[in-house]
Amino acid sequence: MLKAGIVGLPNVGKSTLFNALVANAQAEAANYPFCTIEPNSGIVSVPDPRLNQLATLSSSKEIIPTKVEFVDIAGLVKGASQGEGLGNKFLANIREVDAIVHVVRCFENDDVIHVSGSVGPARDAEVINLELGLADLSQVEKRRERLKKQARTSKEAQAEDGVLERVQAELEAGGAARNVALSAEEALLLKPLGLLTAKPIIYATNVSEDDLAGGNAYCQELAAVAKQEGAATVRISAQVEAELIELPEADRAEFLAGLGVEEGGLQSLIRATYALLGLRTYFTTGEKETRAWTIQAGMTAPQAAGVIHTDFERGFIRAQTIGTQQLLEAGSLAAARNKGWLRAEGKEYIVAEGDVMEFLFNV
């Protein structure tokens, strides 16, 4: 399951956004599995209209969406890398996530105090990035110290230390671990450290309701920072998300349209996260259930089958495949088969976004 950590300075709207996302997901997907793990962590169902359309087509008894766990990570202040505030707890929590959603205040409001006295997206981003970088630098230095003796006789330790030396140089220059070009083997050496600046980052520009559709100068300022870092950005409004909670689901689309946007913050954030991490969705559908499955882009049909069960991958023979839109156009699997639209794909097939698949296997 994808796990995203939501970080940000105090009073940027981080917790408001988290609470709204989790509450909206629960309201939007009342018939989907949902749970709150603890007050600062919630598993939400990924909104996907294709899932409901396929379930209707198949008269499915159950709908099972993919899920994302959002973690509201508290305690990040200047000096967190030295344990200030809830720094140590913050760092332990964030090391476990797949991606970091960095909420940055991009709205003016005299009633909401800014910790630095004024709104400054680039400055705020730098504060958090500095803390992440300092925490990583400390961890890399400690690891290299432990490797000293091993590196005298172990080629593996020498290889790891060589990678860490390059990462340390980047961190000392104020950069991020993700900026260091690594081979697949070298990346595996780094993975156990859970370096914070190696994780993909999305900047969520938290704007007022009036700026949700078009953004503002603060958004442009942060977009320039993100471009320089190779990070993603998504515009979001904690204020709007909180208002959505109070509306009946049937009225939400009209409310968002009135603001000039087509989707709420949860959809925008998940879409951006999937794109950043290179994730794809495929479906299985039938009378028993219609289900969405998350895979990495580039996965072959057997690998995608293995996400369901390892036996499916081990004994893979072929996959009956059709695109979601084509299946919906046909009206049923039987009609699609009669039209010759169902494809038998083999072991080399790369699964496409939105494929509907049925696997034939033998173990």
How would you describe each model-predicted region?
Residues 21, 83-86, 115-118, 216-220, ...:
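Short, glycine/charged-enriched secondary-structure capping and boundary segments
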Residues 1-84, 88-111:
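Conserved G1/Walker A P-loop phosphate-binding module
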Residues 34, 48-51, 64-70, 84-98, ...:
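Amphipathic alpha-helical transducer elements in NTP-driven molecular machines
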Residues 42-47, 74-84, 95-156, 170-183, ...:
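Conserved Switch II/interswitch segment of TRAFAC-class P-loop GTPases
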Residues 2-7, 12, 18, 146-353, ...:
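C-terminal-of-GTPase-core extension/linker across diverse P-loop GTPases
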